[in-house]
Amino acid sequence: MSLQPQAETLSFEAEVKQLLHLVAHSLYSNKEIFLRELISNSSDAADKLRYQALSDAALYENDADLKIWIDFDKDNRTITIRDNGIGMSREEVIENLGTIAKSGTRAFRELLAEKKAEDSQLIGQFGVGFYSAFIVADRVVVRTRRAGMKADQGVEWESTGEGEYTLKNIDKPTRGTEVVLHLKESEEEFLDPLRLRAIITKYSDHILLPIVMKKIKTSGADDEDKNETPEEEVVNRANALWVLPKDKIKDEEYKELYKHIAHDFEDPLAWVHNKVEGKLEYTTLLYIPARAPFDLWNREGQRGLKLYVKRIFIMDDAEHFMPMYLRFVKGIVDSNDLPLNISRELLQSNEVINKIKAGCVKRILSLLEDLAKNDKEKYASFWKAFGQVLKEGPAEDFANRDRIANLLRFASTHNDTDEQNVSLQDYISRMKPEQNKIYYIVADTYTSAKNSPLLEVFRKKDIEVLLMSDRVDEWLVAHLNEFEGKSLQSIAKGTLDLGDLEKEEKVETEKFEKDFDELLKQFKEVLGEKIKDVRITHRLTDSPTCVVFDENEMSGHLQRLLIQTGQDFMQAKPILEINPSHPLILRVKNESDKTRFNRWADLLLNQALLAEGEQLKDPASFVKGLNELLLDS
């Protein structure tokens, strides 16, 4: 096999340069995390080797005793982190150490361009990982060889953490990766074995792999022993944290394990640890992150839990344990009932998987219910980060639809804020005695919903309306038809139906209908194919007109969403409703000039469409007609 050129100098991609700058300038106060990150990488490398070796044992190269070694050299001011995990090929070195994952590049650029994100947020979103080495080092050397490749196919990577790095081929008899940090002059504290041990205990005690260091010699050791090979000792617990009893695990240990498995810089928002025994035996440790990842809305992106079978790592991102609407959940599943060689294909049709999935969903929903009841501030944080994703739940999980519905939060006319903090239970508790429906409106924005003329009669009668403006809301209400026996009713579709709450208004409207019959005919004649119908309404108190859509047709908001996604569909025409008591309508009713009447009819329709959120097909004509009416008045 021909080798790559012996040595070459390459440039970091622009995003890596930015990330390196952030790491160097933003993490200095917490610089000891470099060791946590590099140990975590070594642990991941061992997990990958174990998994690939299930189908190709030769990858172990007669060395299946996986470890991480930490060493230091005071004279040369170096710290070395070495593992015998999967290692990397030359191409993988370039991909892993020279670029940010392609899925994250665009998002990284956008956050940098906006300059809204704190440095810590950027680091938390995209991971510190290997680059944390440059917090304490002014030069880093990586030597690596992928398992299964020849000894002369090793690679050496070197950089000072600025604009470039060099690559060359080397002989490396053993597989795995060695990272050598040449420390800055100010970082001598990390050349102390006790300091290194303290960091490992603090951040990496939970790592399943043994972390090995040379034994510290006692002060009475003989000088004769100087030339002997120092004894090694394991300096972490090296056991599966999740198999321990919950009362034996500290919160800090839970948090550090989360950071390791989720590659997150921040503490989790909440977690739940559970062991199931009986016919089916498994342990789950599930975390809810504090912040949404940059790729939350990429439904095809990597997601899922870490799968272990009898404490042996099987795979990352096992997506079959969580439904799509809970794709933000991180964690571990450790089963005693799955085969060690289970594949992603087998996960799809395995009955054990389905039972574990049901248990995982139950635990997460219970955790969210507990937060919603007992820690409203924390639940508000959860909702801000993941509420829109949870709204996908009623459509995807019929069995848990009622539990999910109880967890939903909305903005409402009850509060003068766009904060989504009203539950369906809250709404029902404030319903009028005669009221039997939950009213809502879906609009492009909160402001558009709040100012909709369709709300006028509801404000007059002090009836609460849920204000929805998330893109997912149309999907939600299409699948959530009722809650606790109360049907959900859009105020933008069909005729107004307030039951006994609108008796007086109905009587008034009936009085107007005969008197306005001729006006309605004139409107229909002028507006023609632009509308489906024109009718008198009592839902307006301040506005002259509004538009609604038929009960069984798509709302204007949903039609706009479909247009934005390029979907082909039969567009529904709006129904124009007029307020018979409004001065403008009375003026138009008495308009004898046909040209002016036509202008008024167009103006009133377009005005209603704008209030509904619609974009006018011909705004110039609208402005021209408006100006002409103003000049005539």
UniProtKB/Swiss-Prot annotation:
Which Gene3D superfamilies does the record match to this protein?
Answer: 3.30.230.80, 3.40.50.11260, Heat shock protein 90, C-terminal domain (1.20.120.790), Histidine kinase-like ATPase, C-terminal domain (3.30.565.10)
Q: Which Pfam families match?
A: HATPase_c_3, HSP90
Ranges in a coiled coil: none
Molecular function (Gene Ontology), one example: ATP binding
The answer on whether this UniProt entry bears the keyword Nucleotide-binding reads: yes
Q: Where is this region: B?
A: 345-560
Any GO BP annotation: DNA damage response
| Record key words, sorted | ATP-binding, Chaperone, Cytoplasm, Nucleotide-binding, Stress response
- Chief subcellular site? cytoplasm
What InterPro entries does the entry give?
HATPase_C_sf (IPR036890), Heat_shock_protein_90_CS (IPR019805), HSP90_C (IPR037196), Hsp90_fam (IPR001404), Hsp90_N (IPR020575), Ribosomal_Su5_D2-typ_SF (IPR020568)
Which residue stretches belong to region A? 1-344
Instruction: Please give the residue ranges the record annotates as the region C.
Output: 561-633
An example GO CC term for this entry is:
cytosol
- Which cellular compartments is it found in? Cytoplasm
Task: Please give the SUPFAM superfamilies that the UniProt record associates with this protein.
Answer: ATPase domain of HSP90 chaperone/DNA topoisomerase II/histidine kinase, HSP90 C-terminal domain, Ribosomal protein S5 domain 2-like
- Functional note: Molecular chaperone. Has ATPase activity.
- Hey, which family's this protein in? Belongs to the heat shock protein 90 family.
Record text on subunit structure and interactions: Homodimer.
Listed name of the protein: Chaperone protein HtpG
Q: What is the taxonomic lineage of the source species?
A: Bacteria, Pseudomonadati, Pseudomonadota, Gammaproteobacteria, Legionellales
Q: Which gene encodes it?
A: htpG
